[in-house]
Amino acid sequence: MSAGVRSEPMKVVFINTQYVQTDARSFKTIVQELTGKNAVVADGPYEFSGQGYGGKDSSQRFCGVGKEAERGVETTEFDSFFREMPPVGELYNLWSDH
């Protein structure tokens, strides 16, 4: 280095790529573990119109989802959970009454 020339220290960032497969219920927890940050979720009014994206009934979005198997479609335990679950609007009404 020549006299009088000052350089800034170099910042080095290491990126550790990880591939994670999770379900919707565990997504928030996984993100918090990977980022080391807690999410802040604001309370607010929750409304359920009974219709999903594009005006379609959202209860149909979870039916028929499964892994492709060699001999047809294999239904997962997660899919069964959503088929047996009451509508989200009904759950919200039950929880908000207490």
Curated annotation (Swiss-Prot):
GO (cellular component) term, any one: nucleus
Motif mapping: VQ: 27-36
Localization in the cell: Nucleus
UniProt keyword annotation of Nucleus present: yes
Domain of life: Eukaryota
Keyword Nucleus applies: yes
Known partners and oligomeric status: Interacts with WRKY33.
Keywords: Nucleus
Gene name of the record: VQ1
Protein role: May modulate WRKY transcription factor activities.
Protein's recorded name: VQ motif-containing protein 1
